[in-house]
Amino acid sequence: MSYFVVFAICIQACLFHNVYSQCLGRVGPGGPPLGPYGGPLGGPGYGPVGYGGCGGYGGSGIGNVAVAGELPVVGSSAVMGQVPVIGAVEFAGPACAVGSVSISGACGPTCGCGGLPYY
């Protein structure tokens, strides 16, 4: 085979791994976290001390954001991309504001596989 064909196959394998590793949760390529048994797959220095292999990052997390006080804000903000958020959005109190707010999304894991959340 030519070097280009081998290179193209390697790129396809990396893309395939990137797409299908998003729903693995805590289960890495070596199966469930088995401590030292998944050692070479977890990265250098992690397997032999009891940390198993790591799966792809599914974008799940837990956090709270609270803002209180006066917020004199002038300008515009634009947020684009994927922000996996599960929770509620609340705005209360008097505010002299002009503009529009659009909040849309879907509850649950973004990949729909129901993996375990990271704490």
UniProtKB/Swiss-Prot annotation:
User: What keywords are assigned to this protein?
Assistant: Repeat, Signal
Task: Identify the domain of life.
Answer: Eukaryota
Which GO annotations describe the biological process of this protein?
Answer: chorion-containing eggshell formation
InterPro entries assigned to the protein according to its UniProt record, in alphabetical order:
Chorion
Q: Where is this region: Left arm?
A: 22-55
* GO molecular function terms noted in the UniProt entry: structural constituent of egg chorion
For this UniProt entry, which residues form the secretion signal?
Answer: 1-21
Residues covered by region (Right arm): 104-119
For the region Central domain, give the residue spans: 56-103
An annotated GO cellular component of this protein is:
egg chorion
General function of this protein: This protein is one of many from the eggshell of the silk moth.
The UniProt entry's sequence similarity note says: Belongs to the chorion protein family.
Question: Which named protein is this?
Answer: Chorion class CA protein ERA.3
**Gene encoding it?**
ERA.3
